[in-house]
Each structure stands twice: as C-alpha cells, then as structure tokens.
Amino acid sequence: APPVLVLLFHGAHAALHAIAGAQRRLQRCCGQAAHGQPGFAAAVLLQSKLVRFKPLLRTALFAPVVTTLVAVALIWRYLLHTRYGLVNAGLGWLGIDPVDWLGDPRWAMPAIVLLAVWKNFGANMIIFIAALQAIPDELYEAARLDGARRWALFRHITLPMLGPTLLMVSVLTLAGYFQLFAEPYVMTQGGPLQSTVSVLYLMYEEGFRWWNLGQASAIAFLLFVLMVATTQVLLRLGRRGEAAASA
C-alpha cells in the first residue's frame, strides 16, 4: 500500500483508540467547566453596598491566582491527608468518619476540581468586577425611577450588560479545565484507578511515559477540535442571546 495510506490508517486507528480512552475524560472536563462561574457571584457580592472591607476581601480572594500551583497543590494534599489532614480533623470534631479524599475514586476528582476552582475563580472575579464597574449608573437610576426592584435591576440591566463578559469567561474557563494537568499530576498522579486522569494528563502519559506518540498526537488533535467546536457553540449562543436582547 502507498505510504500515505498506511500513515492515514495508523493515524485513524490511533485516533479511534484515543477517543475511546478519552471519552470519559472529556465528559468529566465538560462537567468540571460548569464549576467555573463562582467568580460571578463573588463579584456581584463585592459590588454590593452591604459588604465592608472590599479591598481586603478582593485581595484575599485574588491571592490564590498569583500563588504557585505546585506549592498550592502540595499544601492541599496535606490538608486532605486521611490521617493528619485538617479537613478530616474538622470532620472528626463534627463526629464524621475520615474520608480518603485522594485515595477514593469517588472523592479524588471532586477534591481536585475544588482545588482548581479555588485557585482560579479569583481571576474570573476580577474580570466580572471590572465589567460591573463599567455599567453606567444612569441605567440603574432610570430604572429605579420607574419603580424597578433589585431583582428587576439585576435581570434587565446587569445580566444583559454582562453578556459578552459571561461569554468570554465561559470560553476561558472551559479551555482552562480542558487543560487540567498540574493538579492531578502533583496530587494523585492520575490515581486512584485513573479516576483523576484528565485529557491533557492522558496525552502526557501516552506521549512521554509510554511513548505512544501516535495516540498522544490523536488526543491533542481531538482536544483541539473539541475546544474549537465548543468555542464556536458558545459564540453562537452568545450572538443569539444578544440578538434576543436587542429585539
């Protein structure tokens, strides 16, 4: 057979094998991306007039973003230790049995997702705060003169004005979770029972641990196509939302 056909056959076989192995990881990443919006709630709360010490709270919530990920992951690994971790110590004070956070397949990935959310949501919070501060106060004042309440202000002014920002943060958050690597690499090495193997970690193992370069390349290409397709879907949904709001 011609060399080109041989290469295409092997590439297709590697891609199908990689897709079969990465399907669960892709679904998990899509589920994790839904946890990337707590920064919006924090930004709205910090913009409220009821909150005091706003600069201090902003600094405290943004601090995890600028810390070294490896150091933070190591600290979290000790915090979640089964016997000596502070988390299980707190559960013990409440009369709850200790949980093997990083050794139980049911809890390992939620623990890593919690770390990722805590580490990164401060960046989204700053973006949302900047977008909230850019909304003209005249819009709120005019709505209050018409008798609008807080929920109406939030629904008809804040959310429509934050539409492009919400879209951008959704795309960035999804891309970030698809690239989840350092957290499982430092905390669990993909275990237990490969329950914390992300798509990027699977690509790393196939390419640099087992030297299955064909499968690693197929996973990388699959990840690229999936991210482009998902971004296009989000952009189309954003354009539809803007069209509906302006209609």
Residue spans of the language-model regions?
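A structural signal for multi-pass alpha-helical bundles of membrane permease subunits
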Residues: 1-247
